[in-house]
Regions:
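Surface-exposed amphipathic alpha-helices with a cationic face
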Residues: 94-101
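C-terminal alpha-helical cap of glycosyltransferases
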Residues: 317-337
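Nucleotide-sugar donor-binding catalytic core of glycosyltransferases
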Residues: 2-76, 85-92, 115-274
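A short, histidine- and acid-enriched strand-loop-helix "catalytic/donor-clamping" loop
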Residues: 106-118
C-alpha cells in the first residue's frame, strides 16, 4: 500500500461527519487519490424502509443501491475501500468487492447491536461483518462483544478524535459563568439539563424549551470553536450507547481549549484523567456541585483546561489514521505472502 494507491470512501457527506474528517486527514498525510461515493439520499430512504420492513420495497431499494455501488467499483481502480457504517449494503455488494480483491475496512461510529434507531444498525451489517478485512469500532466494550461473536474478523479499537482543520482554538474572552452544551436532544440529556441550577446555553436540534436554559439552533464548526472558547464550562453528556466509553465531543472540547465537564466514564478517564484534564460527574447533584467548584476555583480549572489541550494533541484524526494505515500495511503483506 503506497500513497498513490486509490482509496475509496463510502458514506454520508455532511460537514461535521466522520467521513469528511477522515478525508481531510488522508489528504493531510499525502493520500490524495481519493474517490468518495456519498450516499446521503439512499441512506435516508433505507432508514425510512427500516420502519416499514417491507421485503418488496427492500428488493427495489437493493437494486438501485447495488447499481450505484457497482458503477463506483468498476469505474475506479480501488486498492482500499473504507465504508462508514454501511447498514444499507446487502450481501451482493460484498461479493463484488471480494472479486476485485479490494482491502475492505469499516469504520463504525455507532453500536451495531442497537436496533432502536433505524439509522444506527441493520440486519445487513450484522450479516456481513465477517466480509471486512478490518472492522473498526470506537468502544472497547463493543470490541470485546464483536470478537466473541465473529471469530474470524479483525476488530480494531479506533476511538473518535478531533479534526485539525475543523476543531481549532479561537481566541475569545471567556464569558464568566457561561455554561454551554452542544448536542442533539434525548430524554436523559433533557432530564439532566433540567436539574442544573445555573443557566445553560444549549445548541442543537429538536430541543424543547426550558424554564431556565436558553435553546439555540445547531452550530457548525466555526461557531462551535467560538462557543467553546467563550464558555467557562463545556458540558459533555454521554448518551446511553456511550456510557463508560466516550463520544466525539470527548476530544473536540479539549482540542478547542475548552474546560470539559463530562459524564464519568472509564475510557474518558484514560484519555483525560479526572481532576487533571477534565471534570466528571455521575448524578445531577454532583453535576451542580462541580459547576460551583469550577466557578469558585478559576486558577485550578485554568490548569485543567491547559493540560487537557496539550493531551488532546495526540488524538487528532491524522494520528488515528496513521495508526490504522500501519495495520493495513500488515494485512496487505499477509495477502501478498
Amino acid at each position: 500500500m503506497n500513497k498513490k494507491d486509490q482509496i475509496g470512501i463510502f458514506g454520508l457527506n455532511y460537514e461535521n461527519n466522520l467521513e469528511n474528517f477522515y478525508i481531510n486527514s488522508l489528504k493531510n498525510i499525502k493520500y490524495d487519490n481519493i474517490k468518495f461515493l456519498e450516499n446521503n439520499f439512499l441512506f435516508y430512504v433505507f432508514c425510512i424502509l427500516q420502519k416499514f420492513n417491507n421485503k418488496y420495497l427492500f428488493r427495489l431499494f437493493n437494486f438501485f443501491q447495488n447499481l450505484k455501488f457497482k458503477k463506483f467499483i468498476y469505474k475506479n481502480d480501488l486498492k482500499i475501500l473504507i465504508i462508514f457504517k454501511g447498514i444499507e449494503l446487502d450481501s451482493n455488494i460484498y461479493k463484488i468487492i471480494k472479486n476485485k480483491k479490494i482491502i475492505l475496512v469499516n469504520i463504525y461510529p455507532d453500536d451495531p447491536f442497537n436496533f432502536e434507531s433505524p439509522a444506527t444498525s441493520s440486519k445487513n451489517i450484522i450479516k456481513n461483518i465477517e466480509n471486512y478485512d478490518i472492522f473498526c469500532i470506537w468502544s472497547k466494550k463493543l470490541k470485546k462483544k464483536l470478537e466473541s461473536r465473529y471469530k474470524n474478523t479483525i476488530f480494531f479499537y479506533l476511538p473518535f478524535g478531533y479534526s485539525e482543520e475543523k476543531h481549532f482554538v479561537k481566541k475569545n474572552n471567556i464569558i464568566k459563568k457561561k455554561i454551554s452544551f452542544i448536542g442533539s436532544y434525548d430524554k436523559k440529556r433533557y432530564d439532566l439539563l433540567k436539574g442544573i441550577n445555573q443557566t445553560v446555553d444549549i445548541y442543537g436540534n429538536d430541543w424543547p424549551s426550558f424554564e431556565r436554559h436558553k435553546v439555540h439552533k445547531y452550530v457548525k464548526n466555526k461557531e462551535l470553536a467560538k462557543i467553546i472558547a467563550q464558555s467557562e464550562i463545556s458540558l459533555n453528556l454521554l448518551k446511553k450507547q456511550n456510557l463508560n466509553s466516550h463520544n466525539m465531543r470527548t476530544f473536540e472540547i479539549p482540542s478547542m481549549r475548552g474546560l470539559m465537564l463530562t459524564t464519568r466514564s472509564y475510557e474518558q478517564n484514560i484519555f483525560f484523567p479526572e481532576n487533571r484534564a477534565s471534570l466528571m460527574f455521575t448524578s445531577t447533584k454532583e453535576l451542580n456541585k462541580k459547576i460551583e467548584y469550577i466557578f469558585n476555583n478559576p486558577i485550578i480549572t485554568k490548569k485543567i483546561r491547559a493540560r487537557a489541550y496539550l493531551m488532546s494533541k495526540k488524538h487528532s484524526y491524522n494520528m488515528r489514521l496513521k495508526y490504522l494505515i500501519k495495520h493495513l500495511y500488515e494485512i496487505n503483506k499477509i495477502r501478498k505472502s
